[in-house]
Curated annotation (Swiss-Prot):
Record PTM N-acetylproline, positions in chain: P3
Protein name: Ribulose bisphosphate carboxylase large chain
Task performed by this protein: RuBisCO catalyzes two reactions: the carboxylation of D-ribulose 1,5-bisphosphate, the primary event in carbon dioxide fixation, as well as the oxidative fragmentation of the pentose substrate in the photorespiration process. Both reactions occur simultaneously and in competition at the same active site.
Primary site of residence: plastid
Originating species: Mesostigma viride
Amino acid sequence: MSPKTETKAGTGFKAGVKDYKLTYYTPDYVVKDTDILAAFRMTPQPGVPPEECGAAVAAESSTGTWTTVWTDGLTSLDRYKGRCYDLEPVAGEENQYIAYVAYPIDLFEEGSVTNLFTSIVGNVFGFKALRALRLEDLRIPVAYVKTFQGPPHGIQVERDKLNKYGRPLLGCTIKPKLGLSAKNYGRACYECLRGGLDFTKDDENVNSQPFMRWRDRFLFVAEAIFKSQSETGEIKGHYLNATAATCEEMLKRAAYAKELGVPIIMHDYLTGGFTANTSLAAYCRDNGLLLHIHRAMHAVIDRQKNHGIHFRVLAKALRLSGGDHLHSGTVVGKLEGEREVTLGFVDLMRDDYIEKDRSRGVYFTQDWCSMGGVMPVASGGIHVWHMPALTEIFGDDSCLQFGGGTLGHPWGNAPGAVANRVALEACVQARNEGRDLAREGNDVIRAACKWSPELAAACEVWKEIKFEFETIDTL
């Protein structure tokens, strides 16, 4: 049996909490290549030793409970237990630590983000001995990565399907997000697509409401896609939101989209759930549909610095579960996102191999072992004046999505789309000529205004619009 431990009362927690550190705090442990590694930002209750808290996190997220039980003797805890193998004080924070925990791979079902999260971010987050707990990062070993399908297609296959290379893709979320009839909604999509955008998008809360049922929306949007394609000679798409009350209904909507011949559908992966998302990603891979992922609800989970789950973990989970696009913030728009932190998890979404880099919040080296990449989507409060910064920050393998920044154009949707496309092409050309967009971006946009009245009108409307607030979640 595992060694019995003394139950004692201590400051900050009630009698009956045992000393986890005797079994689960192992600073001499040598990490295995197959271990799943977690970095937790941990704030103990006053009087609780950090070693005890780190061990408690390891125990309660793996094999442990609050007392020794006789059935411990029926298995090998040394083989299956999580281990807190390192503690690191957080600079500038009193009584806060990064606890590093190693989990044996055998604790987790193959190919299941749901099972992975149920253990690692489960009941332990309500543990009384902890004032706060946040999962900052996960290292997914190659042996576990290979049990997942990952993105249905990935960045390169998407570009091949769309026949679009050498620039970011352009999108637009249709507004108002709720209340339009299906026919008017389809017309708004058509105007944006014929104006030069690659995609339009359902808002995350557009499902199948009384004012616009899903089947009607799918039909009118498909008409908009095909009409704009025939006029422009470019492949177009619209993120048809297949999120539904049940998995069965979700897959029915996906099947109807395939029947219509549209190239891409959409899912709200956090509100819809990882099980549903993985099922939908498998359907998309089998049926040639691209899958756009919205992160609605993420800020409830990731925005607080001391408690919850950092978005880089949610992004890794999405890459495992499956998605071709994922919203990732803008750095410069209306939504939360520090530059270096954002670039850190954008690389984790797109690249094959990412080195540990604490300056960008990357706690572990991550090898995706040739799993397809996820295209980051920059969306939220952006307009034409942001185009140079967005092009410079996100690079070519990204989708820049302007909702109000397209539909708010004084001349209408199509001129708004023209303005965005002209601004993007001007920025890409300037970058390819070797110009510094960070320094010369505004000059590039002003020069393009001289031969694009649509862009000039957009620049005039949004010349004073800025979202300059301090980021809450900093390194």
